[in-house]
């Protein structure tokens, strides 16, 4: 019997799927298979896929909200940083100005003190120079008088020392 069925199949021309005598049987199994696939998809696979998609959507939404909050916090932190930086710069400029004023005041005091010391030393030096000049002039006058007296005594032995001294003093004065 198996050989007869095999022989009939071999004798039939064309593809067995296109044999119209087996269409009702193939359509029945096609419907059963499609219904089984539909039930498996609707009861098992699609709910899992839907839950994964919903979870992903929730995660993305939460992440976007967190990112927006962090962005706002970063903007606020940047504003606070810029304000603190501006305050620090202003404070630094204030400190620099105070330090400059203090240094200038110290410099003015030191300059005034140095000027006073220089003026005092200058007065002392001028006094010493005047004393040295007077001493030098006295020495010059004395040397000139002695020299003149020696010369006059050699040339005119009868000349008086007082007259020679008076003549030298008058000549030295100018």
Swiss-Prot record:
It is found in: Cell inner membrane. CDD domains: ATP-synt_Fo_b (cd06503). GO terms for cellular component: plasma membrane; proton-transporting ATP synthase complex. The chain crosses the membrane at residues 27-47. Signal peptide: none annotated. It is a single-pass membrane protein. Keywords: ATP synthesis, Cell inner membrane, Cell membrane, CF(0), Hydrogen ion transport, Ion transport, Membrane, Transmembrane, Transmembrane helix, Transport. NCBIfam families: PRK13454.1. F(1)F(0) ATP synthase produces ATP from ADP in the presence of a proton or sodium gradient. F-type ATPases consist of two structural domains, F(1) containing the extramembraneous catalytic core and F(0) containing the membrane proton channel, linked together by a central stalk and a peripheral stalk. During catalysis, ATP synthesis in the catalytic domain of F(1) is coupled via a rotary mechanism of the central stalk subunits to proton translocation. Component of the F(0) channel, it forms part of the peripheral stalk, linking F(1) to F(0). The b'-subunit is a diverged and duplicated form of b found in plants and photosynthetic bacteria. F-type ATPases have 2 components, F(1) - the catalytic core - and F(0) - the membrane proton channel. F(1) has five subunits: alpha(3), beta(3), gamma(1), delta(1), epsilon(1). F(0) has three main subunits: a(1), b(2) and c(10-14). The alpha and beta chains form an alternating ring which encloses part of the gamma chain. F(1) is attached to F(0) by a central stalk formed by the gamma and epsilon chains, while a peripheral stalk is formed by the delta and b chains. This is ATP synthase subunit b 2. It comes from Dinoroseobacter shibae (strain DSM 16493 / NCIMB 14021 / DFL 12). The gene is atpF2.
